[in-house]
Amino acid sequence: MADTTGRIPLWLIGTVTGIPVIGLIGIFFYGSYSGLGSSL
């Protein structure tokens, strides 16, 4: 698994999977602050 030759770089996987997670967390906190999070 350490050999990234011919595979997707680990930093690319972390970026692609990290951005949506951060976005969802941001939307969750934004919804809770605006009062929409309580309905979820």
UniProtKB/Swiss-Prot annotation:
Location, primary (coarse class):
plastid
Q: How does it sit in the membrane?
A: Single-pass membrane protein
GO biological process terms, alphabetically, are:
photosynthesis
Instruction: List the SUPFAM superfamilies.
Output: Photosystem II reaction center protein J, PsbJ
**Keywords per UniProt:** Chloroplast, Membrane, Photosynthesis, Photosystem II, Plastid, Reaction center, Thylakoid, Transmembrane, Transmembrane helix
Where do transmembrane segments lie in this chain? 8-28
Record's superkingdom?
Eukaryota
Gene3D superfamilies per UniProt: 6.10.250.2070
The record's subcellular locations are: Plastid, Chloroplast thylakoid membrane
Q: Name one GO cellular component term.
A: chloroplast thylakoid membrane
Task: Please provide an example of a Pfam family that matches this protein in its UniProt record.
Answer: PsbJ
InterPro entries per UniProt:
PSII_PsbJ, PSII_PsbJ_sf
Subunit structure, briefly? PSII is composed of 1 copy each of membrane proteins PsbA, PsbB, PsbC, PsbD, PsbE, PsbF, PsbH, PsbI, PsbJ, PsbK, PsbL, PsbM, PsbT, PsbX, PsbY, PsbZ, Psb30/Ycf12, at least 3 peripheral proteins of the oxygen-evolving complex and a large number of cofactors. It forms dimeric complexes.
- In UniProt terms, what function does this protein have? One of the components of the core complex of photosystem II (PSII). PSII is a light-driven water:plastoquinone oxidoreductase that uses light energy to abstract electrons from H(2)O, generating O(2) and a proton gradient subsequently used for ATP formation. It consists of a core antenna complex that captures photons, and an electron transfer chain that converts photonic excitation into a charge separation.
> Which family is it part of?
Belongs to the PsbJ family.
Q: What is this protein called?
A: Photosystem II reaction center protein J
Organism whose genome encodes this protein: Vitis vinifera
